[in-house]
Amino acid sequence: MDETAEIERTWARHRRDYETYLKLERSMAGNSVAAYMHDFAHLERFAIEQHLEPEQITLRDLQLLLKHFSDLEIAPTSQRRMISGWRMFFHMLVIEDAIKDSPADLLDLPIRPKHLPDVLNDDEVTLIQQTFDRSTPEGERNYTIVEVLYGCGLRVSELVNLKLSNIYVDEQYLQVIGKGDKERWVPINERALELMLTYIHNVRSHVPVKPGEDKYVFLNRRGHRLSRQMVFIMLRDAVAAAGIKKTVSPHSLRHSFATELVENGADLRAVQEMLGHESISTTEIYTHLTRDTLRNTIAAYHPHYSKK
């Protein structure tokens, strides 16, 4: 039997097992599973090229593979995710008694960059919204999307997966399904709720909805659920039309939502709950932003700081 073919079959089997492990044991959402499986494909390809079974892979092998991606200038955040995925894969093999120890546990994580998305202020969000022609179905939809992202702090994946049944009008809450299919309840302000209901009743009701898509809130003109990429493109074009010289993505609106809350004295635990952060340390980054804002304000306006 051809050695390469046998190794390929072995890795194909592990690939199926790993995908099942991510879905069932780690309770990962579809987007996360796809990202980790993409990273796994790099490991699989490398191992097959080197004629390595999973149990033959060493720390040195993984370091060489990681160096390859570092030389390609793959972002540190992507490298960290790769390492995280490899660790989960080898951890699965340890559980299955296929290997004794994981070679990935000793990999050094690349330093996480401290770059954060640009923050938009309220006036800039208004400028973005003013670029939409609300007399058109797409314009009214896009205006509403920006309001919901900025007013509720949703991830773009949460927005496009939002269902009609997730809107609790009387309570003024959205039921949001976040990372790992974890549920949380996010307040929605009157303005955002009114815009959403107007869109649903006056715009969405006239869209020829495709089978299976009728449960989703935001649809394209052909009746399909909006994709994340469509929201990215819509916002990018609106920012350019508004003349805003910042790098803006849907995550920037979520980031701006959290920054506004923290800078205006919101309880950090409440912000953590609304954002769906597992760890308070993730939310604490916004307190660091607040300190930077204070420092910059003093530097700009206090006479002793502004002295040369």
What residue ranges belong to the model's regions?
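Conserved catalytic core of the tyrosine transesterase superfamily
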Residues: 1-308
